[in-house]
């Protein structure tokens, strides 16, 4: 039996009919969340400010602000952690010095939308970052990729 994937335009149509304020994409690793987000941005919220993350396995996770291209490390690989998915230790300075101010700038910006790719378990470690995400959700419409994991922060989203 063939597997059918929804197109970006059909997802946007369903989203608009739903009356929802935010569009959160969730799923396991490698399921195409970021690919779908990249297809949705030009159709739903072109020109929106973005915060993206990039993971470098066995090394680090970086956060990047689209305006100005600033980058900070928010996670560092720790080989002492048990083998599995979550072997990065949060780096508070990355969240506090770049992530939180970037979220505040997005909330104060002119665009109706903000884009976050992706929110995961590292963010759970920084209350200030979590609060800034919540404030952004109150201030803007948000298109976001949310990692499918069981953490208090991600569950609250």
Locate predicted features.
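Extreme N-terminal, non-catalytic leader segments
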Residues: 1-21
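Conserved P-loop
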Residues: 14-104, 156-157
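A short linear-motif detector with a strong N-terminal bias
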Residues: 2-4, 28-33, 42-45, 121-124, ...
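A conditional alpha-helix N-cap/helix-loop micro-motif detector
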Residues: 3-5, 88, 92-96, 122-126
């Amino acid at each position: 039996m063939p597997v059918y994937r929804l197109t970006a335009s059909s997802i946007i149509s369903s989203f608009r009919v739903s009356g929802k304020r935010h569009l959160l994409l969730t799923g396991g690793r490698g399921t195409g969340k970021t690919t779908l987000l990249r297809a949705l941005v030009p159709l739903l919220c072109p020109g929106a400010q973005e915060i993206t993350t990039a993971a470098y396995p066995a090394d680090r996770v970086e956060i990047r602000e689209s305006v100005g291209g600033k980058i900070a490390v928010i996670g560092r690989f720790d080989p002492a952690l048990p083998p599995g998915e979550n072997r990065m230790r949060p780096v508070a300075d990355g969240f506090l010095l770049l992530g939180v101010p970037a979220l505040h700038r997005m909330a104060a910006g002119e665009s109706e939308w903000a884009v976050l790719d992706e929110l995961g378990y590292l963010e759970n470690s920084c209350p200030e970052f979590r609060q800034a995400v919540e404030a952004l959700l109150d201030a803007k419409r948000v298109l976001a990729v949310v990692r499918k994991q069981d953490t208090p922060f991600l569950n609250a989203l």
